[in-house]
Every structure is written in C-alpha cells, then in structure tokens.
Amino acid sequence: MSLATEEQIGESSYVPNVDGITKISKSSFMGYLMCPRQFWWNHLADVPRPPPTEAMIRGGKVHKVMEVGLLEGADAVDRAVAEEGVDPLDPAIESMTSLLHQIAYDLGGFDIIEVEKKHQIFEKLNVAEIGKVDVIWVGMIDAVLRHPDGGLILTELKTGNMGVGKLGRTRRELCFYKMILDKMGIYEPITHFLYICPDYQLVVDREDKLLLEGSKRGKSLWLGDHNGIAILEPVGSRSLNAFEKRLNDTLPNLFSHKWDMNWNDYFCMTWCDFNSACQQELHAEELGF
C-alpha cells in the first residue's frame, strides 16, 4: 500500500476492472450503494454527463466559504462570500458563521491538520469471490482538526436539510475517509466525527429526532441562531464494523458488474437524471416483455 503514482492515477478508471486499476472514491462508493444502475449510467454508459445543478454549484461555494472560515476565522467569512459570489442573504452563511464561532469557542480554537486535501492511495486488494485487484482509494476531506483532548476530528459540511437518515449516510462517508487515512498511517488516531449542517431547519410540528443526538454519551450539539446544526461525536466501533461489512459485501458486486436497479418513487423521480430509462424498463417488465 502506498501513495498512488502519477502513472497509476493516469491508468486508473472508475470502471471496475479486475485487469486494470480501479478508482474508488467516497462519492463513487456511496453512489453504488445508493443505486448500482445509476452508477452504471454515471461511469460506464457512453452518455453526456448532466451539468451541475444550482444546488451543487451553491454547495461548492458554501464549502469554499467554510474553508476560509476554518483557516482564517469566522470574521473572514464575509470576504469569502463576496469572492465566491454567494448571496450574502443566504441563511446558510449566517448559520455557518454562528456554528463556527460556537465550535471554535468550545474546542479552544481550530487546530487544523488539513483542509480539502486530496488523497489517492494505491492498494493491491483481495476481494472475496474475485481475488486480487488493483485499487486507488480517493478521498478529499472537508477538514481534519485536532481534538483538544487528543486525536483527530474528521469534519464534513453538508448543505441541504439534515435528518437522522442523512446523518447515518454521512457517518458512513466519514468512515470511508477514516479508512483512507488509516491506510496512509501518517496521522494520529481519528477519534471524532464533526458534522456541520448550515441549512438544517428545526422541526416545529413534531419531535425532531436529530436533536436527541446531543443527549447521547460523548456527543456535543450546536444550533445556529435561526437555522443550522452541528454535531460532534466519538467514532464508534459499531459504525466502523457496519461500514467494513458493507464495504466487503459491496466490492464483489462492484467487480462482478452487477448493475441492479434500486427503484424508489421519490428518490429516483426527484434526484436521478436517468429515471426515464428505468421507468421504461419497469413498464416493460409489468407488460411481460
């Protein structure tokens, strides 16, 4: 296991190939978990990629603003907002600034190890039912901070609203990043995950289960003035074990080129650019073709 060379990176592809070098990023892994068929459309089908949505563009800009806030302090956020062309009235900016102030105060400031640094690790991996394959693990973590009690904090910014389901998926993403840093072996142990969610809106008409996270052992929770939530939690062995099992169960399917459809009436119709093709297939199956 080693840092991937420029030659290895140039020869790699997101197309799973037992005879070549397969690139596996957090996004591609989570994408395959979400829907293997959508993964096929994104990485194997010879079709034009859809342009980024307004939400994706906004999310990228908000990430950049947070990067400046971490590196230069929350007082630098206004300048970053202007430079990135973010709407200064975007409520996420106010809530993120408030959250960063609160977190920095409680942690005694931000001791930053890295921000938005891309890692690419080459490994000869033994995959069940497949054998040895060459893999490049790819990860770019929003931020790695040092915890005041020792150990490191993996930090993830999530735009869009946040709930317990999305929190669980984000936890899996951070487990993926932890795996990469552990393989590198260059840092001290990773002990905490931090989720910063500036778009979160408090549920007022029913119990908000996300708020219960703050009462769990070892966890801390911060709320913005109007919107936004941040949660700091210890890395749990249960989450790591579940991630490892999911990874080991998924890789044989990925390298066996299994492109099953995980149809969901809401998700597919709302978020997938390729839903019409799947709808046609489902309709044909209903008709017995």
Model regions and ranges:
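Long, acidic, intrinsically disordered low-complexity segments
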Residues: M1-I24
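Catalytic cores of nuclease domains that cleave nucleic-acid phosphodiester backbones
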Residues: S2-E6, V68-M162, K183-I190, L202-V203
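Short amphipathic alpha-helical segments and their helix-coil junctions
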Residues: S13-I21, P36-R49, L154, K245-K258
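Nuclease catalytic cores
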Residues: T22, K26-A74, I93, E116, ...
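Metal-dependent nuclease catalytic regions and adjoining charged, substrate-binding loops involved
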Residues: I24, K124, V164-L167, D182-F289
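A short beta-strand motif that forms part of the nucleic acid-binding face
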Residues: A45, L157-N161, C197
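An active-site-proximal "capping" alpha-helix that borders the catalytic cofactor pocket
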Residues: T170-K183
